[in-house]
């Protein structure tokens, strides 16, 4: 998400595409130091695609000035997080043959691929959304 906010839509998406491609050819860039074609096309492939799409969307928002103020930057990063979760959980459900949602205690894509990470990811989105406007102010003041 930060790549999109800093680099803009096209460069942000390309940087995430490069990340996915380098991981797919075997570099240990993915979670827990994994990489390779199996990791890139497995159950978590949707999250990798989501990174690319989210970087593009957050980048577009940044190109329209939504990275300059706290009141617009944080929602942009939260939207990016939702995009990653939407694409990722959708693919996870498909790949594992799980329902997207389920009854409490029943396995679902949301319970396995969103719930365990939600608090940490929201905190990271809030932190990035708060830091980016401050960083731009620092950079612009230094000119």
Which residues does each predicted region cover?
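Alpha-helical membrane segments and adjacent membrane-interface helices in multi-pass membrane proteins
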Residues: 1-57
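Membrane-embedded alpha-helical hairpins and interfacial helices in multi-pass inner-membrane proteins
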Residues: 65-142
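Short helix-perturbing small/polar motifs within transmembrane alpha-helices
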Residues: 37-86
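Transmembrane alpha-helix boundary and packing residues in multipass membrane permease domains
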Residues: 19-20, 55, 59, 89, ...
